From Swiss-Prot:
PANTHER family: REGULATOR OF RPOS, TRANSCRIPTIONAL REGULATORY PROTEIN QSEB. Phosphorylated by QseC. Residues 2-116 form the Response regulatory domain. This is Transcriptional regulatory protein QseB. SMART domains: REC, Trans_reg_C. It comes from Haemophilus influenzae (strain ATCC 51907 / DSM 11121 / KW20 / Rd). Keywords: Cytoplasm, DNA-binding, Phosphoprotein, Transcription, Transcription regulation, Two-component regulatory system. Member of a two-component regulatory system QseB/QseC. One of its GO terms (cellular component) is protein-DNA complex.
Length: 221
């Protein structure tokens, strides 16, 4: 899943980018409010981690402008502003969650996963589809109650398909969702990952919708 991170503290921002990437997220990091606000429309982000005390444009103003422009991406405020009034104001301005610094990386990741699941209509960390069970907390996959070994890329690709079980995904949208600006997924690599998933989960589990992209097997053209 692709995350937009707006944080001006280099130590915190670098730690979040590295840590969340290791946990399977693709992370684009910006250090000021003005650039971060503009970045939201540049890629299909699944969620935003937003600091409030930012140079050039305050994080609360960034959030308010997004919401006034009908940008509905889930936003997790991550800030040192910890008073009750500030937390209430952040949530009333359109934030979906609010977490105060200092924080634990595991909690940030768990909150992001919960926000993204809700966006796609799921309320549990275990997603099941056609005999395949994906556990986001354990990052494990089971087929007919048997564990399946996947690479990190294969897991992220499978997670994307299962969260979008009723949608056809184009090649470009898959590549954008799974990579940050600091990395790219080549078209050939995507073909290899899809081939490997079909070998492990069944050839019909991921269907090619000719001229459009890919979908889980039960999705109609």
């Amino acid at each position: 899943m692709r995350i937009l991170l707006i944080e001006d503290d280099n130590l915190i921002g670098n730690g979040l980018q590295i840590g969340l990437t290791k946990l399977g997220f693709a992370v684009d990091w910006f250090t000021d409010g003005k650039t971060g606000m503009a970045a939201l429309t540049s890629a299909p982000y699944d969620a935003v981690v937003l600091d409030l005390t930012l140079p050039k444009l305050d994080g609360l103003e960034v959030l308010q402008q997004w919401r006034s422009n009908h940008q509905d991406v889930p936003v997790l405020i991550l800030t040192a502003r910890d008073t009750l009034d500030e937390r209430v104001k952040g949530l009333q301005s359109g934030a979906d969650d609010y977490l105060c610094k200092p924080f634990a990386l595991a909690e940030v990741a768990a909150r992001l996963q919960a926000l993204i699941r809700r966006r796609y209509g799921y309320h549990h960390s275990v997603i099941e589809q056609a005999g395949v069970k994906l556990d986001q907390n354990q990052r494990s996959v089971w087929l007919n109650n048997q564990p399946i070994s996947l690479t990190s890329r294969e897991y992220k690709l499978l997670e994307l398909f299962m969260l979008n079980k009723d949608r056809v995904l184009s090649r470009s949208s898959i590549e954008e969702k799974l990579s940050s600006w600091d990395e790219e997924i080549s078209s050939g690599a995507l073909d290899v990952h899809i081939y490997n998933l079909r070998q492990k989960l069944g050839k019909q589990f991921i269907r090619t919708v000719h001229g459009v992209g890919y979908a889980l097997g039960q999705v109609e053209k």
